[in-house]
């Protein structure tokens, strides 16, 4: 009997963390995406004169939605340790700016497509993939958000659009630079791309 209780306790201990996570990552990501959609649909932010205000609102949401440090670490992978602490900090800032510059205009081109969140898949104890689909007249676009649990909050560290991972895409680009050049060369490249050279 005692052995049975021990086994049941262990099973409950293994099951509870997964059960406790159910629903929360999806709801968290959906909440952020809904806020983005609210900004994009706001009539007061439609005029060209409100473009900066719209971008500022979107940036504020992305800062809560994404873990840009984790995203940066995963993008550089083993090359992350080649950067000094100061270089790591600057890289995160520059990479964040690059992503904002690259994707904000694409997001602002939104034309009232419907976004449906379908399910979440547990990847590890602290990482989950939240799956969604953008419904357009021309077809469906699958978008998966990979999130990690940090400080009791689910934050996005990668986005997979139609099977293409944002992290893997940039990792291959940065790997080519770091394969034969020092970290400072990568940082200088990013400075030029975001206009901070």
Please identify what each model-predicted range represents.
Residues 24-103:
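Early exported N-terminus immediately downstream of N-terminal targeting peptides
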Residues 15-18:
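N-terminal signal peptide c-region/cleavage motif recognized by signal peptidases
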Residues 95, 119-121, 134-136, 147-149, ...:
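A mature extracytoplasmic/lumenal domain signature
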Residues 101-141, 193-197:
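Surface-exposed, charged secondary-structure patches
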Residues 24-27, 38, 42-45, 49, ...:
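Surface-exposed, polar/charged faces of alpha-helical domains
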Residues 158-197:
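Low-complexity, intrinsically disordered terminal/linker segments enriched in charged
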Residues 1-8:
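Bacterial N-terminal signal peptides that target proteins for export
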Residues 140-142, 146-168:
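Short beta-strand edge/turn micro-motifs at domain boundaries
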């Amino acid at each position: 009997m005692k052995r049975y209780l021990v086994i049941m306790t262990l099973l409950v201990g293994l099951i509870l963390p997964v059960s406790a996570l159910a629903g929360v990552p999806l709801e968290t990501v959906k909440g952020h995406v809904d806020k983005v959609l609210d900004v994009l649909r706001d009539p007061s932010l439609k005029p060209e004169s409100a473009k900066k205000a719209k971008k500022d609102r979107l940036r504020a949401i992305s800062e809560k939605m994404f873990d840009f440090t984790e995203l940066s670490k995963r993008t550089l992978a083993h090359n992350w340790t080649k950067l000094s602490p100061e270089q790591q900090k600057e890289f995160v800032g520059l990479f964040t700016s690059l992503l904002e510059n690259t994707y904000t205009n694409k997001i602002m081109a939104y034309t009232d497509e419907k976004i449906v969140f379908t399910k979440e898949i547990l990847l590890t104890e602290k990482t989950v993939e939240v799956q969604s689909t953008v419904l357009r007249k021309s077809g469906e676009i699958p978008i998966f958000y990979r999130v990690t649990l940090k400080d009791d909050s689910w934050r996005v560290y990668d986005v997979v659009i139609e099977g293409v991972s944002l992290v893997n895409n940039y990792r291959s680009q940065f790997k080519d630079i770091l394969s034969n050049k020092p970290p400072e060369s990568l940082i200088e490249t990013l400075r030029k791309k975001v206009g901070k050279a």
